[in-house]
Amino acid sequence: MIDSSLPLTDIHRHLDGNIRAQTILDLGREFNIALPASTLDTLRPHVQVTSLEPDLVSFLAKLDWGVKVLASLEACRRVAYENVEDAARNGLHYVELRFSPRYMAMTHQLPVDGVVEAVIAGVREGSRDFQVDARLIGILSRTFGEAACQEELAALLAHREGITALDLAGDELGFPGALFLNHFNQARDAGWHITVHAGEAAGPESIWQAIRELGAERIGHGVKAVEDPALMDYLAEHQIGIESCLTSNVQTSTVASLAQHPLKQFLEHGVLASLNTDDPAVQGVDIIHEYTVAAPAAGLSREQIRQAQINGLTQAFLSEQEKAALIQRVAKG
């Protein structure tokens, strides 16, 4: 189902949600951190979804184990490097890795600025070693509140040349986008692209807010957009992309099943929706699974899957020259 003549992209992939079980085990041992299990096989059910039953609470608990072992900046660099290696193993030509430096820093009180620097270094090294074009998106974790997000933003802005875009993630019901207008004004002034998690827990109004008030060029998940025909028209007309994450949306109970996922409706409406993973290590899936298993289960035709692959490149935070170069590189094999 993957068109090998086209670049394969993943533009919604959390770096801090893709920490290998083996790495969690290694770092736990290195820093004497108590883990729920002492072998890889027994640890895996604690850090990776193994049940088909959607369970958001369980999902988030598994997600947290990855950052609980980040006890040094070198550990942060390592997981960033391994993220690019994983992307290469998945056959990705281009990947946008997003991360919340405060979330990564919080368990062991690491300097947030240092985390940003370590992640940038790890991704650069990985891109060089594995020949994957990898870009970084900084996340403001809105659940921490406005002041903490300003500190997080300051750490990202201190290394602005290594960051491509800004994202807002977390509790969109309790911390709506309106609280972060100033943060995103600063991001746009820095020349960054904007993507926002919206329409996942909250309704279409959250997506409208992300677009109109925060300047979102893309929306993460955005499943509730189908509830508002005017919004669907707007997304298509203004080429605002939807970063769809099929398996993740089922595992977190955002949608009831793959068959009920709105990705097919997005594509039929002309919305530039793409296929992405989200938190692959926690989910126990990769981009190949999303194309070959999840997308057909969501009702997508072969041509719609190809369109989603094209949309991933169209919506990538790259210049037109960079996109053309990527297409040429893939064509040459």
Swiss-Prot record:
Gene name for this UniProt entry: add
Cofactor binding notes: Binds 1 zinc ion per subunit.
Keywords: Hydrolase, Metal-binding, Nucleotide metabolism, Zinc
Entries under SUPFAM superfamilies matching the protein: Metallo-dependent hydrolases (SSF51556)
Cofactor(s) listed in the protein's UniProt record: Zn(2+)
Any GO CC annotation of this UniProt entry: cytosol
Binding site for Zn(2+): H12, H14, H197, D278
Protein name: Adenosine deaminase
Organism: Klebsiella pneumoniae (strain 342)
Signal peptide limits: none
Transmembrane segments: none
InterPro entries, alphabetized: A/AMP_deam_AS (IPR006650), A_deaminase (IPR028893), A_deaminase_dom (IPR001365), Ado/ade_deaminase (IPR006330), Metal_Hydrolase (IPR032466)
Family matches, as PROSITE patterns: A_DEAMINASE
Positions annotated to bind substrate: H14, D16, G170, D279
Role this protein plays: Catalyzes the hydrolytic deamination of adenosine and 2-deoxyadenosine.
Assigned EC number: 3.5.4.4
Protein family according to the UniProt entry: Belongs to the metallo-dependent hydrolases superfamily. Adenosine and AMP deaminases family. Adenosine deaminase subfamily.
Active-site residue numbers: E200
Reaction catalysis annotation: adenosine + H2O + H(+) = inosine + NH4(+); 2'-deoxyadenosine + H2O + H(+) = 2'-deoxyinosine + NH4(+)
Residues under site feature: Important for catalytic activity: H221
Listed GO MF terms: 2'-deoxyadenosine deaminase activity; adenosine deaminase activity; zinc ion binding
GO biological process: adenosine catabolic process; hypoxanthine salvage; inosine biosynthetic process; nucleotide metabolic process; purine ribonucleoside monophosphate biosynthetic process
Short name of any one Pfam family annotated for the protein: A_deaminase
Origin: domain of life: Bacteria
